[in-house]
């Protein structure tokens, strides 16, 4: 026994060259481990990586879609705001034009009413003046006849003669007023 130990110790095996049995066992273990990794672990990693890539790409696509929708909504909002401002300006201008038209109509109606009232007042004044002239002619005629009969000393009871005297007197009076007015 000592002899085997000594012969083993003296036997010249190279420590750098592995034992072929050890090498076979290690290679078989590596092959089994490699098969398990390739068959089960790598597909799980690939599946996880694919899901992550899909989630990231889907998130990017969703973000781009949301950005596009937000941009479209912003453009629609701006367009609606522009349309609303244009509509407000149009309504404001229509209101101004309508107000100006109403004001012009009211001024026209006021001018027509003023002209009507003025014409009515002139007509009323003229009718009152005519009534006053008729009344005054009658009174002046009576007074003139009475005064003339006192001055002349004779009675002017004849109506035709009295009417001529009154008419002549009034004509003289109108001539004096017309001359004084000029």
Swiss-Prot record:
Q: Is Glycoprotein included in the keywords of this UniProt record?
A: no
**Key word Ion transport present in the record?**
yes
A molecular function annotated in GO for this UniProt entry is: proton-transporting ATPase activity, rotational mechanism
Task: Output the superkingdom of the source species.
Answer: Bacteria
User: What's its membrane topology?
Assistant: Single-pass membrane protein
For this UniProt entry, which segments traverse the membrane? 25-45
What is the protein's major site of localization?
membrane
Q: Tell where it localizes.
A: Cell membrane
InterPro entries linked: ATP_synth_B-like_membr_sf (IPR028987), ATP_synth_b/b'su_bac/chlpt (IPR002146), ATP_synth_F0_bsu_bac (IPR005864), ATP_synthase_B_chain (IPR050059)
GO cellular component terms listed in the entry, alphabetical order: plasma membrane; proton-transporting ATP synthase complex
Print the keywords alphabetically: ATP synthesis, Cell membrane, CF(0), Hydrogen ion transport, Ion transport, Membrane, Transmembrane, Transmembrane helix, Transport
Main function: F(1)F(0) ATP synthase produces ATP from ADP in the presence of a proton or sodium gradient. F-type ATPases consist of two structural domains, F(1) containing the extramembraneous catalytic core and F(0) containing the membrane proton channel, linked together by a central stalk and a peripheral stalk. During catalysis, ATP synthesis in the catalytic domain of F(1) is coupled via a rotary mechanism of the central stalk subunits to proton translocation.
Q: Quaternary form?
A: F-type ATPases have 2 components, F(1) - the catalytic core - and F(0) - the membrane proton channel. F(1) has five subunits: alpha(3), beta(3), gamma(1), delta(1), epsilon(1). F(0) has three main subunits: a(1), b(2) and c(10-14). The alpha and beta chains form an alternating ring which encloses part of the gamma chain. F(1) is attached to F(0) by a central stalk formed by the gamma and epsilon chains, while a peripheral stalk is formed by the delta and b chains.
User: In which family does this protein belong, per the annotation?
Assistant: Belongs to the ATPase B chain family.
Q: What is this protein called?
A: ATP synthase subunit b
